[in-house]
């Protein structure tokens, strides 16, 4: 696996906020300035922050602070959209291991911005309230060591599968030993029949991904409802990496509803060098993954 280049900014984080902003037209791009104080006890520690569209679950920003500075500081987050509500998660890496650990090992908090209406400043209040935010992998097309809670490599195809879920969303990473398309299907009944299939390819730096379903043993078709929340992919040195997120239960009759803690049958396939989704696989296999439960 390759190491991901992380955008480094000076930013700050909090557990609550107050928003006093004017009203502008819906859908306009805005910038929010987070203004932070009272973080001196954490000076020198690392913070991670992400901003998520509360309605669609699309992550719109993810930032890393390598060292929290002493004194007051601020960060601009943009572009956000008017008329949109956001969930803001952050944690302070108190034990310095570079990864998220549930409180009280790390300090983690969550707050919401409801119906953002304009650019403006947010007064962030740092308090002692902690929340297990279950920090998820970044859907950026690069799978890094330890990014996902679970990982396996399928011996039949050579595809490495990475996964992590919360109560609502499943996040998947795939590393394929080829430059063609790669696919994964959940819940097959007979070969491809009944499977909820995601197939993706990266060509000239552009990811193409489709939500399909298996209608027969060897036939799959495009789903009329695309239920992928977010996706990204990269290709380098003869290897294709794809990451995506989707709802465990989308409500789409062509999707298989998944349940936390469930062991799910999985089909895997790839083409060694063709990005055409009509090209027959050069390798395929079946396996199973067990989703996170108790969440």
Segments and roles (model prediction):
Residues 71-75, 120, 240-242:
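Short strand-edge motifs at loop-to-beta-strand transitions and within beta-strands
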Residues 94-131:
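Structured interaction patches on ligand/partner-binding surfaces of diverse proteins
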Residues 33-44:
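Structural motif
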Residues 55-74:
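Short, acidic Ser/Thr/Gly-rich low-complexity loop/linker segments typical of extracellular
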Residues 74-87:
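Short Pro-Gly-centered beta-turn/loop motif in secreted/extracellular proteins
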Residues 11-23:
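Bacterial N-terminal signal peptides
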Residues 136-295:
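Extracellular-facing/secreted segment signature in eukaryotic proteins
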Residues 48-52, 87-91, 183-185:
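Beta-strand signatures of extracellular beta-sandwich domains
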């Amino acid at each position: 696996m390759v190491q991901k280049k992380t955008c480094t900014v000076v930013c700050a984080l909090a557990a609550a906020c107050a928003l006093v902003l004017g009203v502008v037209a819906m859908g306009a791009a805005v910038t929010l300035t987070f203004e932070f104080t009272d973080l001196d006890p954490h000076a020198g520690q690392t913070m991670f922050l992400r901003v998520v569209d509360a309605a669609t679950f699309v992550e719109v920003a993810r930032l890393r602070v390598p060292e929290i500075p002493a004194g007051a500081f601020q960060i601009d987050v943009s572009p956000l959209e008017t008329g949109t509500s956001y969930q803001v998660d952050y944690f302070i890496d108190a034990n310095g291991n570079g990864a998220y650990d549930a409180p009280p090992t790390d300090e983690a908090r969550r707050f919401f911005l409801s119906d953002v209406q304009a650019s403006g400043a947010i007064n962030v209040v740092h308090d002692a309230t902690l929340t297990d935010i279950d920090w998820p992998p970044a859907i950026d097309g690069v799978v890094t060591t330890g990014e996902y809670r679970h990982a396996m490599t399928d011996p039949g195809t050579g595809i490495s599968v990475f996964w992590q879920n919360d109560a609502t969303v499943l996040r998947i990473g795939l590393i394929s030993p080829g430059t063609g398309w790669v696919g994964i299907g959940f819940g097959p009944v007979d070969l491809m029949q009944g499977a909820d299939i995601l197939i993706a390819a990266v060509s000239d730096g552009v990811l193409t991904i489709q939500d399909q379903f298996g209608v027969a043993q060897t036939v799959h078709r495009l789903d009329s409802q695309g239920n992928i929340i977010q996706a990204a992919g990269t290709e380098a040195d003869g290897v294709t990496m794809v990451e995506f997120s989707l709802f465990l239960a989308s409500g789409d009759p062509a999707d298989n509803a998944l349940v936390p803690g469930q062991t799910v049958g999985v089909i895997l396939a790839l083409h060694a060098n063709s990005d055409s989704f009509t090209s027959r696989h050069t390798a395929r296999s079946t396996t199973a993954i067990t989703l996170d439960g108790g969440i």
